[in-house]
């Protein structure tokens, strides 16, 4: 029951590219993003930061660093266009430069998570934030 409540809280106020990110993750990994990665390790999910626990968590760390480089839009809220062609993510060419960057960040993390499915460890699925050690800066 606690897990369902946490997932409901994560979904409240979700908009824009966050929904697109979750869709990309599902397309690449076959895993429901909020359920499997919403509180994974120290870096997956909103407001989480710390030394990565494994390669899966490292994907999220790199994604946060990618978002930090984006200027001119809100990576978590502003929508962009992309398509799924021949089992590949294709960011829309008509996206403004900022949203093109956001799409590429999201595409990279989705692919990284797929490439590291073998490192996914259920013990990190709902990992307590206090157990995370300070991470290096991006």
Swiss-Prot record:
Keyword Cell membrane: no
Record GO biological process: arachidonate secretion; lipid catabolic process; negative regulation of T cell proliferation; phospholipid metabolic process
Binding of Ca(2+), residues: 45, 47
GO cellular-component term (any): extracellular region
Cofactor binding note: Binds 1 Ca(2+) ion.
Pfam family, one: Phospholip_A2_1
UniProt signal peptide: 1-16
Catalysed reactions, as listed in the record: a 1,2-diacyl-sn-glycero-3-phosphocholine + H2O = a 1-acyl-sn-glycero-3-phosphocholine + a fatty acid + H(+)
Self-association and partners: Exists as a monomer in both solution and crystal states. In the presence of SDS or probably in the presence of phospholipids, assembles to form SDS-resistant stable oligomers.
Protein name: Basic phospholipase A2 BP-II
């Amino acid at each position: 029951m606690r897990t369902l409540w946490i997932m409901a809280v994560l979904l409240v106020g979700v908009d824009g590219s966050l929904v697109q990110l979750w869709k990309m993750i599902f397309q690449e990994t076959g895993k429901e993003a909020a359920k499997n990665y919403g509180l994974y390790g120290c870096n997956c999910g909103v407001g989480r930061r710390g030394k990565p626990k494994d390669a899966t968590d490292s994907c999220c760390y790199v994604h946060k660093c990618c978002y930090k480089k984006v200027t001119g839009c809100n990576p978590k809220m502003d929508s962009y266009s992309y398509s799924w062609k021949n089992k590949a993510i294709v960011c829309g060419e008509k996206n403004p430069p900022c949203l093109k960057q956001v799409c590429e960040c999201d595409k990279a993390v989705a692919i990284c998570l797929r490439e590291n499915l073998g490192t996914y460890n259920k013990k990190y699925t709902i990992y307590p934030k206090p157990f995370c050690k300070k991470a290096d800066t991006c």
